[in-house]
Amino acid sequence: MISSVFRKIFGTKNDREVKKYIKRVAQINALEPTYEKMSDDELKIKFNELKAQVVEEKVTLDQILNDVFALVREASKRVLKMRHFDVQLIGGMVLNEGRIAEMKTGEGKTLVATLPVILNAMSGKGVHVVTVNDYLAKRDATQMGELYNFLGLSVDVILSGGYDDEVRQAAYNADITYGTNSEFGFDYLRDNMKFEAGQKVQRGHNFVIVDEVDSILIDEARTPLIISGPTNRTLDGYIRADQVAKQLTRGTPADPNMPGSKPTGDFIVDEKNRTIMITEAGISKAEKLFGVENLYNLENAVLSHHLDQALKAHNLFEKDVHYVVKDGEVVIVDEFTGRLSEGRRFSEGLHQALEAKEGVKIQEESQTLADTTYQNYFRMYKKLAGMTGTAQTEATEFSQIYNLEVISIPTNVPVKRIDQNDLIYKTQNEKFKAVIDEVKKAHEKGQPVLVGTASIERSEVLHEMLKKAGIPHSVLNAKNHEKEAEIIAQAGVKGAVTIATNMAGRGVDIRINDEVRDLGGLYIIGTERHESRRIDNQLRGRAGRQGDPGMSRFYLSLEDNLLRIFGSDRIKAIMDRLGIDEGESIESRMVTRAVENAQKKVESLHFEARKHLLEYDDVANEQRKTIYKYRDELLDKNYDMSEKIAQNRVEYATNLLDTAEIFHGGLKDDYDIKNLCSIILADCGEEIDESELKGLEYNELVEKIAQILEVRYNEKMSVLNEEQRKDIEKILYLQVLDNAWREHLYQMDILKTGIGLRGYNQKDPLVEYKKESYNLFMELVGRLKTESVKTLQIVRFKSREEQEEQARMMLEASQNAENEPLNYNNQGEDENFTPEKKIPRNAPCPCGSGKKYKDCHGKSGPKKGIFA
């Protein structure tokens, strides 16, 4: 009550923040006449003067903000024929301060972004603008690029599909770079797999503006970015598990109100938490079907995991809702946008389980080579900002996870859209009939209608019903997303009826003419409440842009997933009490609030899941940053590894004596010299005379082994000059580091999969995960030291005479081959070629010629062997 009175007197915190910005807007507006009088050239000169002051650090960005915003607005009027409204200036200031600007649909977020983008690009450190798809990235870069270029700033765009380093480097070196969230994230991961600093494409993380920030930082937060490679694991287990899963029967959980009650069936599905529990009866049945004694023995761990995933595939994942089958492949449908996620796969074997379920080719499992999350990627930026039409419902998460404050920007013109109460029916059939009747009424008077659905399946049901009713319409879902912009652009035409999944063309405005305005504007009909209120608000926001009239209403049923799982008991009781007959609906603010409470429950569950994911990834992220920082040190051309290699030899020798138990029972003279020498030969390819090691104390033995290895190593390296030696050491060391990191990620995946079971032992899984992951990381560090010594010792370089002889023989062979017919029948692979042996093209050639690799053995044509 007190807080309510306080708000009425002083306004909300958001109102007070906006008032502060309004004062500054007046100052910017006062500068407008000054800049209007300037010629184009004078504007450019003034901009360059301000830019020089920023580069020389004579002024801060905040000190010149008024001038820059006024200048940019004037330039926009001349170049784009668009003038920034006062509320757009407020939006620009919010973004510049590293906050989220919540701006309604049609308020011109793309134009708003130009203000902070240009201001921050003046430092020359680069600005990234992130969008949800390639179409919007290209469109915005092209349209706004005219303004940027007018002021002498360069702009480029990162698109999916092309991985040419030089093209991407040029794009990132531009003052302003547009692209999608996934491309920025994957480029970061790929950069940390490079073997030369000059091959990296990104140049740092200075300032980023994330468009549709709720979609990227909230909806996509549970989706890790993973670069993976193939494994050699068999796929038969997925087929066996699928066959067994089909023979198990779904049951019901024990009744908590009945003591002694037991679950029925072979497994229980918890739709609320999206988990499956196999009952004791189910375990026994599965063991018989698999032909094993104990399904949960360590030797059957993979089999039990496959069964869990097969049961999830059959009971929690629905075709045309969670995925589609396209061209013989299972393709994920993004639950928040309704778009197909081409190239993305479910992890932990779930995707293979879905492929087995659908009877399509099962693609091999992959192994993680590099990974991160959007949460940790975007938190690397010195300044992070975002804009969207719907952020307030997730303000707590933005604050806790990203330290981002949400500011709601007033609309330029008041919203005239009428949002009606929900209509709730008992069954889906009744609901869909009511929707068709309502669409028919609107269509007959010419009012355009956009019908929103939660899945492809529902959109196709409505499509068939509208077809039977003889109502012409368009359908927009993941199966025909290529026409997305075209279909959405026509949705506001008189008499248009459009069915759309959640994708609903974000970023594409639905414009209406005066005739449609007189008919009441665009009519939004939602056929199901989404788990997130934001998605519903986005659908509503398609109507009523920039003061246009419009209307929205949701049609629900007790059979809808949200109400069925989270909240229908209370609503059903109300409907029964009111005596609602078949075909009748209930419309009540109380019921609408009950639905919103159900949504809040789900949002809370999802928030906890994302927070949980981040807590675990924060552990991995610290390790990731350590490894990537070390990699960067190795890539530095001035970094000399000699001291590090010498230390590692001592570590290797110490570890060798300790793990091989050369000293028995603490007796220093009782060790097996022959065994020790054979281990060193196997590890390092170095033969050591036993007499050199006899009679030595422990410390002397460590020192002697390290010394012998150093002498032998220096002998091999003598055929190379200093620069070549450094390059070879770095390349080989990086290969060892990457292999060790890859193995570490695999071990971390295994650890994460089973760590939840520690909770049954009254231990905090997160604390246990931190302990275990630290131990694994220390093992990685130890393995890196010893494996690097082995790799560097075992490498052999050919002498100049051997190289020349091999080159002569290969040249003769190639000349003979020119006179022989080509044989395409025997298409064997070069089994010796592996990515690890790839030499960077600009590195000195290891042959000792002094030339770059690309100008020597890296040339096309006959290649000389480098590693003997």
UniProtKB/Swiss-Prot annotation:
Protein topology in the membrane: Peripheral membrane protein
CDD domains with a match to the protein in the record: DEXDc_SecA, SF2_C_secA
Feature: compositional bias, Polar residues: 816-827
Leading EC class: translocase
GO biological process, one term: protein import
InterPro entries for the chain: Helicase_ATP-bd (IPR014001), Helicase_C-like (IPR001650), P-loop_NTPase (IPR027417), SEC_C_motif (IPR004027), SecA (IPR000185), SecA_DEAD (IPR011115), SecA_motor_DEAD (IPR014018), SecA_preprotein_X-link_dom (IPR011130)
Region (Disordered): 816-868
Keyword Transport: yes
Residues the record lists as binding ATP: Q88, G106, E107, G108, K109, T110, D509
EC id: 7.4.2.8
Residues where Zn(2+) binds: C845, C847, C856, H857
Cellular localisation: Cell inner membrane; Cytoplasm
Molecular function per GO: ATP binding; metal ion binding; protein-exporting ATPase activity
CC cofactor note: May bind 1 zinc ion per subunit.
Keywords annotated in UniProt: ATP-binding, Cell inner membrane, Cell membrane, Cytoplasm, Membrane, Metal-binding, Nucleotide-binding, Protein transport, Translocase, Translocation, Transport, Zinc
Function of the protein: Part of the Sec protein translocase complex. Interacts with the SecYEG preprotein conducting channel. Has a central role in coupling the hydrolysis of ATP to the transfer of proteins into and across the cell membrane, serving as an ATP-driven molecular motor driving the stepwise translocation of polypeptide chains across the membrane.
NCBIfam families: PRK09200.1 (NF006630), PRK12904.1 (NF009538), secA (TIGR00963)
Family: Belongs to the SecA family.
Name of the protein in question: Protein translocase subunit SecA
